[in-house]
């Protein structure tokens, strides 16, 4: 190979090397540019969030450049800051979130924050300002943001406030007291309740008569009762009775003549049933329980304003209206009871509103609540007697169930009840010692309830279902199946007696005070 050819080959190699170096330098330059961009981004000072209050001043110079300042709140600092010329000051709205640069210049406006502290509106002033309270009841006077300038805000509404608690940012939907006050039409009727004819008659007289025969009540200058108390041991139908009353009220169009017709003078009315969860009204924050009670009665008055009857049903009333001074660690009842009584007896009329309370422990309810003129009618819903128990069981043992041949449902009910109410040793639960020191035997019949009767029938039905699955055909409900269900209930009840507190158990079950319990072997 000649020298010329060698030089040409070397030149080619050097040119290729130069191209590679140029590409490498180009790539390095791009990477360096990216790195500088990243460094520049990292070197940018942080922006500070603030809440816009109002435009403090604004003017435009001869060159058309805007010179404006704005009042903002950042944390707890209240400041007047300059507004960047590229931000239109006319579009800055109170309550909006704005950004401040390192020199505290307003450089950007964003939407108002959708999270923050929640306050309750205590009062709306004539100029639109709001007095709001926190969970402890501490009042604060605040302004409205631009978004709420013309919003309809009422006492009791909830709002979101800015971090400094100076501006109302957003109005929230009405507080979820619907979880506490359930407006409903229950599907339970008086026909679904067995063995409580006397109690049902009394409560119908107390609740339905005043609304069925308004003219007669006015003619005799008779005021309907303000309230009814259903009390007695648990599981015997207090809540079912209240639901049946609600069902009758909500359906309207009562049978006032007893023959399915409505007299010409009768006014057809349709009622409202407000169910209150008593224990959930209790709140650890001062004044909150009282506020909820006010809301409940306010809602009742609103529903009753058009003349329709309203029933406010308070279950577990003893948990809410406990005797004042009986608290162990606190005495919240000292303010809750007076608030309830003021709503019941207060200046604002409770026309067409009736309170129905249910309690297992009437001895724990404040005596002021129980006096005449408040809860006028007191109905004890006690344990069922034999005939009442049969009537209850008849609702759950019906002729359309698979029964053994030649036996009707009523006969099975009678056999079941007589087994439960037997006083032989096989139904002996325990011996109890009264306060006078005397011992006496306690049988299953002494603690029976409507709920227990239903549970026994359900046990028998469950056993029949299991046997039907095993055999592949319907297994009839028989006396032995029912007897086995009674035996299971008896054993569970007997075993549970060993772990109860005698004094507390006797009070809950509406019995005379018991000092000791000696379980059966």
From Swiss-Prot:
A GO term for molecular function: ATP binding
InterPro entries registered for this protein in UniProt: AAA+_ATPase, AAA_ATPase_domain, ATPase_AAA_core, ATPase_AAA_CS, NA-bd_OB-fold, P-loop_NTPase, Prot_ATP_ID_OB_2nd, Prot_ATP_ID_OB_N
Record: residues binding ATP: 235-240
Coiled-coil boundaries: 4-44
Top-rank taxon, per record: Bacteria
SUPFAM superfamilies: P-loop containing nucleoside triphosphate hydrolases (SSF52540)
One GO cellular component term: proteasome complex
NCBIfam families per the UniProt record, alphabetical: pup_AAA (TIGR03689)
HAMAP family for the chain: ARC_ATPase
Protein name: AAA ATPase forming ring-shaped complexes
Recorded name of the encoding gene: arc
């Amino acid at each position: 190979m000649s020298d010329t050819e060698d030089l040409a080959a070397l030149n080619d190699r050097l040119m290729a090397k130069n191209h590679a170096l140029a590409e490498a330098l180009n790539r390095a330059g791009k990477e360096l540019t990216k790195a500088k961009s990243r460094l520049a981004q990292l070197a940018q000072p942080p922006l500070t969030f603030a809440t816009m209050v109002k435009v403090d001043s604004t003017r435009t110079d001869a060159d058309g450049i805007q010179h404006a300042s704005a009042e903002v709140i950042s944390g707890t600092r209240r400041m007047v800051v300059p507004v960047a010329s590229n931000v239109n000051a006319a579009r800055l709205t109170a309550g909006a979130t704005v950004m401040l640069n390192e020199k505290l210049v307003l450089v950007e406006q964003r939407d108002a924050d959708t999270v923050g502290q929640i306050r309750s509106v205590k009062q709306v002033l004539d100029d639109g300002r709001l007095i709001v309270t926190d969970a402890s009841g501490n009042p604060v006077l605040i302004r409205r943001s631009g978004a709420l300038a013309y919003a309809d805000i009422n006492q009791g509404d909830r709002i979101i406030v800015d971090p400094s608690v100076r501006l109302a940012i957003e109005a929230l939907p009405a507080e979820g007291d619907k979880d506490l006050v359930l407006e409903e039409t229950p599907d339970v009727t008086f026909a679904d309740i067995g063995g409580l004819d006397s109690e049902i008659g009394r409560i119908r007289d107390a609740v339905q008569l005043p609304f069925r025969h308004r003219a007669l009540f006015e003619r005799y200058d008779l005021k309907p009762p303000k309230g009814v108390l259903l009390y007695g041991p648990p599981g015997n139908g207090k809540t079912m009775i209240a639901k049946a009353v609600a069902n009758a009220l909500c359906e309207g169009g009562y049978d006032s003549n007893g023959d399915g017709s409505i007299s010409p003078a009768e006014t057809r009315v349709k009622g409202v049933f407000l169910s209150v969860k008593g224990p959930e009204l209790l709140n650890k924050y001062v004044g909150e329980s009282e506020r909820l009670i006010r809301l409940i009665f306010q809602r009742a008055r609103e529903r009753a304003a058009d003349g329709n009857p309203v029933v406010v049903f308070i279950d577990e009333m003893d948990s809410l209206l406990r005797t004042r001074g009986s608290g162990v660690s606190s005495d919240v009842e000292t303010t809750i009871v007076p608030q309830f009584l003021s709503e019941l007896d207060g200046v604002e009329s409770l026309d067409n509103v009736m309170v129905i309370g249910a309690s297992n422990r009437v001895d724990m309810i404040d005596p002021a609540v129980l006096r005449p003129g408040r809860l006028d009618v007191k109905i004890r819903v006690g344990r069922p007697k034999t005939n009442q128990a049969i009537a209850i069981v008849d609702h759950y043992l019906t002729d359309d169930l698979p029964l053994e041949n030649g036996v009707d449902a009523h006969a099975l009910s009678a056999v079941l009840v007589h087994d439960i109410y037997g006083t032989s040793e096989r139904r002996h639960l325990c011996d109890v010692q009264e306060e006078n020191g005397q011992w006496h035997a306690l049988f299953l019949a002494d603690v029976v309830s409507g709920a227990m009767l239903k549970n026994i029938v359900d046990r028998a039905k469950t056993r029949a279902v299991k046997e039907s699955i095993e055999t592949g055909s319907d297994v009839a409900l028989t006396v032995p199946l029912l007897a086995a269900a009674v035996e299971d209930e008896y054993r569970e009840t007997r075993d549970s007696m060993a772990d109860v507190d005698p004094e507390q158990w006797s009070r809950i079950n509406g019995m005379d005070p018991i000092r000791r319990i000696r379980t059966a072997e």
